[in-house]
Amino acid sequence: MMVPSLSTSISSPALFKNREGGEEGNDGGLEQLQNQVNDLGDLNFNEEGDYNNDQQPTNEEEGTADNELESLMSLVNDNNNNNNNTSGIDDDNNNDIDDNNNNNNNNNNNNNNNNNNKEGLNDLFISSINVSTLLNDLDQLSDTHSHASVSNQSSNGSVRRGYDIKTQRSVGTKGQGGSSGSSPRSNSLRVYRTFPYRGDHHFSWLNNIRDVDSSEDPNSCHNSNNNNKNNKNNQPSSTHDQTNINNNNNNNCNDNEKPIKPNSTNGIRHSRKYKGLQQLDFLGSNIILPQQQQPQPIEDNQQVVPQPFQVDAESNYNNNNNNNNNNNNNNNNNNNNNNNNNNNNNNDNENNQHPINPVNTQNTQQNVTHSNNNNNNNNNNTAPPNQWSELIESLGYGSQSDEQKTFGSTLDDLNNANSCSDLKDLIVDGISINNETSPSQSQEITDFSKIDNLNKNININNNNNTDSQQPLPSIDVNFSHNNNNNNNDNDNNNNNNNNNNNNNNNNNNNNIQDIQIPYHQNDQDYNIQEGNDINNDNYEIRVSNNDDDNDSSNNNNNNNSKFQENLNLLNTGMGGRICKTDQKKQLSRTITFADPSSILSFFGSIPTDEDQNNNNNKNKNTTTTTTTTNTTTTTTTTTSASAAAQNKLDLLSSLSAGQSSGGVGGGNNVLNSSSTPAIKVNHQHKVTEQNRTSSKISLSTIFPKLPPFTNQQSPPTLSPSKYYYPLLQPEPTTLIRGFSSAADINKRGLKRAKKPMEMEDVYLTQYPLGDDQDSQIALFAIFDGHSGKGCAVAAKEIFPNILLKYIKSTKNENGGKPIYDMRGVFLNAFKEVDAQLSKFEYEGATATVCLVWRAGHQRFVQSANVGDSTAFLSYGNETLFLSKDHRATDPEEIQRIKNDGITLTEGQTRINGLMVSRALGDHFIKHLNCGLSGEPYVSPPISITPFHSHLIVASDGLWDVISGNRAMEIVKVQQTEEKMSNSLLQCAIGSIKAKDNISIIVVTLQ
């Protein structure tokens, strides 16, 4: 049952109708209950509903009250047995909310308790908790029933037992058997406060929104239960009638639509006004419009501003421009077979006439025609000029300000003179701005202000009067226009279905028009040809000398346009006739320079003026003549067919001389250009190539080859792409940035492995190597001894001097040239060190030695090792091996031993008790000829690039725990070399896998 919020409601099981008999006229129980309630009104109840009479009753009064209470309880229990939706009795909690009306009635819209005599009981508002006042209010509700005496009701005799739903036990009065019942107050009347959900005054505005929506939308369906919720005149006497009324209330609704709750908070989400209060499109315009929009007649020359919202597909826009011309264009989609076609587009459905959509040149197929009819003055477009078409036009062709910024003046007059749709795609002297996309998607180039080298500076005049005295050569310009499917133009648009007999326009543009445009300087004309090409959409201009053309042009004309092109467009990929199929991807490399000296050393010194003049004289076979007047300066350069394109510096000098004194002065327009031979162009843009000379830098000068190895032996099987870098790198200030070392005996690991507590690892770091402080060589080595540390310590002492000796000897053999490969040095040094360790017969050591040195402007790193101490070099996100583990289980080592004629047993993992197959010392094993060797593995020399950041050299105690990739990840997150080495050491010591000594060297190269 719906109760107004923050109000007090009363619920009593005894107030409901006794349905045991199933007859509507059986109201005896109700009358008896009402009489008992009237008698209880004389009793004194406190505010909490307890029976606390201040006056002490006498025995007779006490007995009478007990009898009355027992009689009332019997009636309550009787009603509880006959009512299937009775609220339970709770002695401790009086705040339970049991909606008996909702349980009795299956319809939630009308609150009817099937009690015709108590219609207003559910709408009772209780302002206080005074039970006496409540009982009086209940008494006033009984208008149609007469009061019956208590004696008639007491003749029933028995008190029926009730059942408490919550406590799950039977209840009854005293002396009637069963468990003891509750007090009359708890069993008969339940007072509670409802939760504030509906009916609050804060939600009253939702009803107004719903009412307004109902009035605006006649077809909208809303629930009408608000008006009939508590309608007393229409309340049925049974649930069946109640359901019928609810069905009648929803007759105007669809079957799938559910009635909206009157005061539900969902009304905000379901409200049409809330959903579309300010629903805007992507441009911020309100798209909510009235449902009916009357079309307004469109007058001549009237601009229609379209609205940025979607229009029905059936809506058409009619432009009623009636002209007397026989060649009028028709904008509708019907087949017009009349001879005299007018632009009267009749729309059958006038109610759907809405403002048109913005012009979409991609989805609209437009055929461009150039009419030769002199009487055709029709300038109708598919869409009238508006803000959307102007925006698209500006994006496609360039705004007026951009034209003025780029060309110095607008192109409107030039377009009108040439009957051309666009002059953006021009090729002047083999230079063009190619527009590969449709005009609507063309990208305009406005960055001409940054171009220093000018190729053409052309001023076009359209007057026939001339003041020129001497015959000037003409410029033949081949102007080719290619129509694509989505071609846009400022001229008239015709459908292919227009079959006008008097129409002289050729929609397929098969006719080629030759248009002569007067040209100022040297009587040069543009010969513009228009043709159809299915591949490109380009305009090409070719300049040629025509001595036979004696036509003259006018100097005085205000309608002129100049456009500037540059030879740099060829280099930037914007010039020339570039087709999609002709484009090739070019490889590029990034070269970093540390200082300007590196740039000069990379590209070489700047050429002097004498060198450039000598280069220019090779390409010239004629002289340059310069004619200077008081107002203008004209420079003309004649070149041969073999030297069509001159040096950029020569062109700049010639143009700068013309620009210094040239320009528009005294009403005269000046052309400053260099003419080139004619290029025959057909309408399919098949152009013969010119012989052009351009300065090229040899690749060998940019990427010099590395010198050959000092040792002719080929490097081991490693990918050369990761080790050889022919790029010149900037010269760093230092050889390395820093290095750090860390070592630990790892007692816990040795104890787990049951090894002697002895540190057998030795590390070596020397920078610079040798006594020379300017030496650009760094040495980093790890020696891991076995069977003692004597051999490792001895190798550490003698290795640096032996290496330095062989480095000097190798440099002397090469004539003092830098060493790019230390392979020979490593092989000789390891051989001599192993020979000097011959006294260590029963001791040995693994050795991993890394050298970092500078050769010229480059740095190199190279490693050599015997045993299982590994060196790693970072390369970006990769990790490169600089060493190779020599163990008896390695397949390559097994094959090497077999090649030496030594037989190995199947599954052999050690060589005379050693896990390694190569080591320093251990000469008693080497004398046995069982496969142990002292020859090192030498890695290829690696040119250090900015991608090589760290070098890690460590004993097998570290690599038994973590991998090289993981070690590089740990190192790269640290800031200093000391933290890098300590992080690796702690990571290895903390692992249960560590069972050996640990020695680590970390070198930062960048």
Swiss-Prot record:
| PROSITE patterns with a match to the protein in the record | PPM_2
Q: What is its EC number?
A: 3.1.3.16
Q: Which SUPFAM superfamilies match?
A: PP2C-like
Gene Ontology terms for molecular function: metal ion binding; protein serine/threonine phosphatase activity
UniProt lists compositionally biased (Low complexity) regions at 77-88, 100-117, 220-234, 244-254, 316-387, 482-511, 552-561, 613-639
Q: Which cofactor does it need?
A: Mg(2+); Mn(2+)
Q: Where is the PPM-type phosphatase domain?
A: 744-1005
**Protein's name according to its UniProt entry:** Probable protein phosphatase DDB_G0279461
According to its UniProt entry, this protein's organism is: Dictyostelium discoideum (Social amoeba)
Lineage, broadest ranks: Eukaryota, Amoebozoa, Evosea, Eumycetozoa, Dictyostelia
